[in-house]
Amino acid sequence: MNDNQMLRVLVTGASGFLGGNILRALRINPRIRPIAACRDSRKISRWFSGDVREGDLIDPQYRRELSKDVDVICHAGTWASMWNHAEIERTHFLAPTCDLIDAAIRNGVRRFIFANTVAIAAKVKDGRPIDDFAPKQHTGYWPHLDRLIDVDDYMHANSTRGMQMVNLRLGHFIGVGNRLGIVPALTPRLRTYLVPWLAGGRKHLPLVADSDLGQAFMRACVAEGLDNYESFNICGTEFPTLREVVSFIAAETGFPKPLYSVPYPAGYAFGWLMETLNPLLPGSPFLTRSIVHLCEDWVCPNDYATRKLGYLPGKDWRSAIREHLADLKAQGYPWPRLCQVV
């Protein structure tokens, strides 16, 4: 984006954890005029004084109008569940997102930046690094992840229609305000003494902190020399093991560390059982296959994003988790629903 005009950047999901951190990063760049999009403008952070386009992304008319007079879209407004809900994932996430892309192309948007995950890549067993364009693999058991892959495929297929497509393969979120992810899912479960190590906790997690997420989107908005389709790993400064992360959470909270270890196939089998029994039990499943999937080996270097976007993560994962845990403690370490409200 190399002209001298103010860049009009629309952020969907602006009232959420990711959208809020994107807005926070955009507002410090004098070249950018951020525009917030969300269902309820009252939930947007009070410090934001820019334009707000209120509406629901499942409304076709709202989608058609949303991207008018916009240069860049940061799409963080996605519906998500950690298990099942295949039909809702199609109607509330996949179809609206693809339609939003089409509307943005018609309205002359120049760049579409999508919040994806490193976990769309095919799993590796030897811990080798996973690059930014690594082949993807549908799981067959986690509808949301599979639809994320479908959106990425749709972006790639439509990247020659005049709007650049930027797929950000984000690491696992950590930071104040996050309620659907690995830390809020694991923390209250540790209190039960029922959480095991997975294969001794030796695999590596791709954590990424709140401020680094915002930085990545801001840099993706203004970067020059991008191809029609781009994919970038966006992770933190290092890749701690599952054992390091869980041990840190236990030390900070006083909750017990796991007392035993199980292999990954056993974790997936127990997750399947809990998902299957969920209709008969209250609340969300104790364990889902998606949680096990997120605890696989995800060493996804940032080198390409550093080279083309100038992205350099700066927040240590321990500091981000410490802040995250303080936020969860203030709420009584709530048991997460693992599914957003429809």
Label the predicted regions.
Residues D126-F173, N178:
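Catalytic helix-loop patch of NAD(P)-dependent Rossmann-fold dehydrogenases
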